[in-house]
Amino acid sequence: LVIVPSRELALQIDNVLRKIAAGIKIVCCYGGHSVREESKSLAVAPALIVGTPGRIADHIRRGRIVLETLDTLVLDEFDKCLALGFQDEMQEIIAPLKNVKKKILTSATDSESLPAFTALKKPVKLNFLGSRKDNETTPTDRLSLYRIDSPIKDKLETLLALLHNLKPGLTLIFCNQRESVDRVRQFLTDRGIIAEAFHGGMGQADRERALCKFRNHSSYICISTDLAARGLDIPEVKYIVHYHLPVDFESFTHRNGRTARMHAEGEAFIILGPTEQMPEYATEATDFRIDPKADFLQTPPMATFHFAAGKKEKISKGDIVGFLTQKGKLAADEIGLIEIKDHYSYVAVTRDK
């Protein structure tokens, strides 16, 4: 049983497991997904269950998960899973797991203490934070941190100027409130800039579509709450922008962890208002000079098509490629990332087509 704090992380882990564990039954359970489909899949005990605390607790409450056969529990991003907002569900999940022989807790940030209900007996800690082999760099080494001062409390114009100064690349902008995410996105959209919003107040399909368009380069910009800070593996994120200051060092670490991945380099920018002070954990940031004449903003190279059919309708990537090449007269190299969900699919194609 693998527990994760967000739907997107559950889907990501489910996708990876299906690639490396072909032939093994896996069930993914999360809010916004069909309870009926999950219940049907759980009727015959799977080898792996991946899910979010609320949905897993609900299935356990209703007797849909066979607890006697569970022998391994994994808490990914455990410090978040065990935070106050999830503790009731987590206690409800862990308490009846009498036959679990192994508990594995993973995160990029440590936790000073663990709730008693985790019932860890003589835990062994493996700490890879900051460790390296000879001649090997860590993500922190490959991350350049910059400071930008906004002359007024409203940072929108400063953000816009920064975006014009960045060469094309995937850019994650972090805000502390959902309303701010929507406001920043609307500001950019009103100026003809393609940008996606991503936060917990959006419907599941809208969240999946936003991440898909960001991953497949239909949008270079995604504005998000800290929902996007943990665990999500979005390749090639070049820039992190802290529109709002992180609430703490852990948030800062997880936000920045979306870039400088897999030996790539990344850049993070902190925008400070007139009365804001740089946090102690970011005092090494270098001042970034805005060039008012710079204009590197470009329209993304891809656009996303939506197909109203997915896995449950037996649609494959080959079906979509065949349709686009035969009916749409597209060349194979004009088709980008294809993502097939349960009942719908997304495909990126070159925008000029």
Residue ranges and their predicted role:
Residues 15, 19-20, 65-137, 276, ...:
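Post-DEXD/H (motif II) to motif III coupling segment of the RecA-like Helicase ATP-binding lobe
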Residues 141-189, 329:
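Conserved interdomain hinge at the start of the Helicase C-terminal
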Residues 1-61, 69-72, 182-200, 209:
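Conserved nucleic-acid-binding Ia/Ib motif block in the N-terminal RecA-like helicase ATPase lobe
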Residues 62-65, 112-122, 185, 227, ...:
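Short regulatory helix/loop adjacent to the ATP-binding pocket of P-loop NTPases
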Residues 50-51, 75, 224, 234, ...:
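Hydrophobic residues in beta-strands of the RecA-like P-loop NTPase core, especially within AAA+ ATPase
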Residues 291-353:
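Non-catalytic terminal extensions of ATP-dependent helicases
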Residues 69, 230-245, 267-271:
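A short beta-strand element within the Helicase C-terminal
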Residues 248-289:
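Conserved segment of the helicase C-terminal RecA-like domain
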